[in-house]
Amino acid sequence: MVSGRIETLLAQLRLQGIDDERLLKAIGDVPRERFIDEAFEHKAWENTALPIGCGQTISQPYMVAKMTSLLALTPTSRVLEIGTGSGYQTAILAHLVGHVCSVERIKGLQWQAKRRLKQLDLHNVSTRHGDGWLGWPARGPYDAIIVTAAPPNIPDALMSQLDDGGVMVLPVGEDQQVLQRIRRTADEFIVDTIEPVRFVPLVKGDLA
């Protein structure tokens, strides 16, 4: 029954324009039900966002797929993720790239995500409790940066941690948010606006 729901979701994603088969395989391989509360387990393979506690959500699979596809990842990419949350997006990335560094401001969520990722034998991930606005400069620069909460503007610290030729994807805005892709060249940042979105805000600081 679960496999049928997975195939239904993958078919929906293809209809929504997600055509990267390596990405679709990763989405099919990562057990989304392991990243949500048991009360919502029956909705695990629906194309919808779900609450994970602490006022945070696990993004809908379409948005996970869309943002990941915009990063243009390769098997050797080094990725910074801001907002580990449940760890679901982290797990998708770990199936696709060489290493993922992920920062989460809420200690309880970071600990739970770390445990889930270890249980799934995903060992190419480093997680850290900290302020996502600051990134993780000690591990940079990065080929790709993905931000899963919306700042009102693009954080300078994250721009500085993007390597030449790198790509950052993030929601930007307060009341009205848009998904943006930033590409770094040798002498400039190129910003593309993709589509309207709705994310929780990227809050400064960290919580115990």
Swiss-Prot record:
SUPFAM superfamilies the UniProt entry points to: S-adenosyl-L-methionine-dependent methyltransferases
One GO BP annotation of this record: protein repair
One Pfam short name: PCMT
Subcellular location: Cytoplasm
Catalytic reaction(s) noted: [protein]-L-isoaspartate + S-adenosyl-L-methionine = [protein]-L-isoaspartate alpha-methyl ester + S-adenosyl-L-homocysteine
EC number: 2.1.1.77
PROSITE patterns recorded: PCMT (PS01279)
Principal subcellular localisation of the protein: cytoplasm
Keyword Transferase: yes
Keywords annotated in UniProt: Cytoplasm, Methyltransferase, S-adenosyl-L-methionine, Transferase
MF (Gene Ontology): protein-L-isoaspartate (D-aspartate) O-methyltransferase activity
CDD domains xref list: AdoMet_MTases (cd02440)
Cellular component, GO annotation: cytoplasm
Positions annotated as active site in the UniProt record: S59
Family stated for the protein in its record: Belongs to the methyltransferase superfamily. L-isoaspartyl/D-aspartyl protein methyltransferase family.
Biological role stated in the UniProt entry: Catalyzes the methyl esterification of L-isoaspartyl residues in peptides and proteins that result from spontaneous decomposition of normal L-aspartyl and L-asparaginyl residues. It plays a role in the repair and/or degradation of damaged proteins.
PANTHER family the record matches: PROTEIN-L-ISOASPARTATE O-METHYLTRANSFERASE, PROTEIN-L-ISOASPARTATE(D-ASPARTATE) O-METHYLTRANSFERASE
Protein name, per record: Protein-L-isoaspartate O-methyltransferase
Organism: Erwinia tasmaniensis (strain DSM 17950 / CFBP 7177 / CIP 109463 / NCPPB 4357 / Et1/99)
